[in-house]
């Protein structure tokens, strides 16, 4: 018999999400590779075998075993769009929205992103780390084992670089594997009011090269984890021409690209982002069906963020059903942030996607594992249970994976395993 460090066996459902390399589209988003009475063998941080329990247990002798009888086991979840490094909160603005104020009205009055900017600029790197750690612990308890984290609340050189430094420290301080994104073009800072082009000059000519230089000597680069560059292409933020400058500069620096597009208004940012080879385009709440063919023909992931529409009390959600049926590779994420989506729960995101985006439970799982991993450059490493992949798994407090989406606001995760180690036990 071969030795292994951990053997999880007797799973009522072993949901592998296994399949050929690459994004899942259309019917493939419903193929979960479920094994009844399944087992997973782990050596170090890597999966070495997946299959029927009798086969795997006959082959491996384990230092430690977990009996998953009566449980479903699935890949760790991937949250591919978050803004969790910031100072302060927006509790008062929440009440303003309850009284009828819109997101755009609050932002125009100096709130929203700009309020968080002021508090984040005043915070030290250590303070940002201490503020974000409890958020990451909560994400982990909900089953997130890999997460993208953006800057974008500094909106000036030093504060944006402090956010990058905080992300690196957070990556080393807790189990969730982080992927950094530089989002200096998140909003026009107040000192550049009426001069958005001048701010883009600063981002392109100074901030992006500094971010690239920071990344080159970072622990992320040493592990081949990418640094993405993102831009908020939206009315009241940056127009298509300004957004193009940011993404074009990122391409020139050899950095992969993302874009917030079509959240409130279709400006043409989606076509621009596809032209520039964006890894993902995020939000797409008002994207019309005429764009789906080009999106489906691309290698770009459509990252949908339904908690934003829910939290803002909007009547429309991204057209996920039509996108999937058209062959678009769809991912889901929390968009965890202090204003438009103050939630850290991917299971809640999946539950809302089933109810309001007309996605099937299996599709939401692929959208938060395989496709989400590709949306942040981690496809083939995390997001599925296959030999050679990182041993990131969830043992659910139920015998059916659909409890992840069925229960609204619950805690369906019994144990979280990251890189072969049990890091959370919720029971």
Swiss-Prot record:
Record field: catalytic activity: 4-imidazolone-5-propanoate + H2O = N-formimidoyl-L-glutamate
Positions annotated to bind 4-imidazolone-5-propanoate: 90, 153, 186, 263, 340
This protein's pathway: Amino-acid degradation; L-histidine degradation into L-glutamate; N-formimidoyl-L-glutamate from L-histidine: step 3/3
Short name of any one Pfam family annotated for the protein: Amidohydro_1
Co-factor note (free text): Binds 1 zinc or iron ion per subunit.
Names of required cofactors: Zn(2+); Fe(3+)
UniProt subcellular location: Cytoplasm
Keywords, comma-separated and alphabetical: Cytoplasm, Histidine metabolism, Hydrolase, Iron, Metal-binding, Zinc
Amino acids binding Fe(3+): 81, 83, 260, 335
Primary enzyme class: hydrolase
Function description: Catalyzes the hydrolytic cleavage of the carbon-nitrogen bond in imidazolone-5-propanoate to yield N-formimidoyl-L-glutamate. It is the third step in the universal histidine degradation pathway.
Name this polypeptide is given: Imidazolonepropionase
Organism: Chloroflexus aggregans (strain MD-66 / DSM 9485)
């Amino acid at each position: 018999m071969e030795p292994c460090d951990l053997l999880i066996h007797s799973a009522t459902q072993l949901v592998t999400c296994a399949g050929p390399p690459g994004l899942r589209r259309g019917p493939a988003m419903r193929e979960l590779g479920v094994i009844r009475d399944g087992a997973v063998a782990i050596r170090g941080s890597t999966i070495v075998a997946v299959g029927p329990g009798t086969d795997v247990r006959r082959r491996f002798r384990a230092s430690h075993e977990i009996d998953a009888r009566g449980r479903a086991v699935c890949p760790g979840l991937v949250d591919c769009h978050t803004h969790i490094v910031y100072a302060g909160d927006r509790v008062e603005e929440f009440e303003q929205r309850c009284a009828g104020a819109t997101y755009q009205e609050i932002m125009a009055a100096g709130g929203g992103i700009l309020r968080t900017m002021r508090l984040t600029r005043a915070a030290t790197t250590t303070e940002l780390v201490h503020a974000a750690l409890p958020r990451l612990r909560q994400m982990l308890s909900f089953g997130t084992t890999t997460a993208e984290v953006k800057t974008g609340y500094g909106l000036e050189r030093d504060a944006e670089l402090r956010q990058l430094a905080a992300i690196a420290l957070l990556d080393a301080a807790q189990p969730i594997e982080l992927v950094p994104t530089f989002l200096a073009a998140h909003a026009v800072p107040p000192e550049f009011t009426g001069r958005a082009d001048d701010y883009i000059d600063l981002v392109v000519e100074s901030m992006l090269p500094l971010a690239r230089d920071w990344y080159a000597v970072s622990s992320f680069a040493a592990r081949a984890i990418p640094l993405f560059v993102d831009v908020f292409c939206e009315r009241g933020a940056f127009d298509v021409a300004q957004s193009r400058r940011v993404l074009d500069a990122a391409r020139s620096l050899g950095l992969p690209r993302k874009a917030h597009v079509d959240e409130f208004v279709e400006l043409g940012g989606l076509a621009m982002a596809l032209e520039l080879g964006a890894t993902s385009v995020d939000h797409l709440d008002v994207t019309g069906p005429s764009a789906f063919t080009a999106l489906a023909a691309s290698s770009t992931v459509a990252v949908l963020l339904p908690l934003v529409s829910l939290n803002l009390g909007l009547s429309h959600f991204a057209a996920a059903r039509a996108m999937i049926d058209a062959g678009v590779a769809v991912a889901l994420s929390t968009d965890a942030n202090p204003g438009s989506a103050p939630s850290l729960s991917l299971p809640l995101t999946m539950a809302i996607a089933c109810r309001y985006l007309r996605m099937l439970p299996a599709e939401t799982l692929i959208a938060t594992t395989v496709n989400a991993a590709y949306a942040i450059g981690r496809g083939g490493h995390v997001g599925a249970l296959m030999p050679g992949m990182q041993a990131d798994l969830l043992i659910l407090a139920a015998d059916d994976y659909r409890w992840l989406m069925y229960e609204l606001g619950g805690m369906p995760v019994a144990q979280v395993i990251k890189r072969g180690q049990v890091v959370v036990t919720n029971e």
